[in-house]
Regions:
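Conserved beta-strand-loop-short alpha-helix elements that form
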Residues: 140
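N-terminal auxiliary "cap/dimerization" subdomain that precedes the catalytic jelly-roll/cupin core
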Residues: 1-57
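Active-site region of the double-stranded beta-helix
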Residues: 4-5, 38-137, 145-177
Length: 178
């Protein structure tokens, strides 16, 4: 659970040093039933939805603006804003796969990525890490790092992108929103 500054300090150090970082939070902070996920999709503004029918994938952007989103999403956005440098932009996207279907082949992003696994399981391969992410697992992937994500079942993964210059060190504590 994100109740002290250890997570923020570890994440900030990993971002500053451009190292992969793994952690986890209480899965109840991200747990949602499929009915609430479908409601989130159905009520999300059309201009903030991207659909890839050939991969059974839906992407919802700017979730932090929604009142119905899990509070942890807004908490993570605030954390990233607090440790980011001026001029950086923080993005959030929910990747929803409605089957165990291919996702992304080997890729590297031009921005730093923080993945939060919310529902279902995915196989993540990044550097020397080859692990199954389950609800509550968090992984930071520095920009330019090769990685592969393979859904093992229907899933929801929150992805936070950080564009711009390098992250500064965390200066303050970080607590979960109630």
């Amino acid at each position: 659970m994100l109740t002290n500054s250890n997570f923020a300090k570890g994440l900030s150090a990993a971002m500053h040093n451009k190292q992969v970082f793994e952690s986890c939070i209480d899965s109840e902070l991200v747990n949602q039933n499929w009915d609430s996920i479908i409601d989130l999709i159905d009520s999300h503004p059309d201009n903030l939805i991207e659909r890839e029918p050939n991969k059974n994938r839906i992407m919802l952007t700017a979730l932090y603006k929604r009142g119905s989103v899990k509070p942890i999403i807004k908490t993570i956005i605030r954390l990233l804003e607090s440790i980011s440098t001026s001029g950086q932009r923080i993005y959030d996207t929910a990747f929803i796969n409605l089957s165990k279907h291919e996702s992304y082949s080997l890729r590297k992003d031009t921005m730093d990525i923080l993945l939060l696994q919310a529902k279902g399981r995915i196989q993540l391969e990044v550097k020397k890490i080859n692990k199954v992410l389950e609800s509550g697992d968090i992984v930071y992937i520095p920009r330019g790092t090769d990685y592969t994500i393979t859904p093992l079942q229907s899933r929801v993964t929150y992805c936070f992108g950080i564009e711009g210059e390098a992250i500064k060190s965390a200066q303050s504590g970080f607590g979960a929103e109630s």
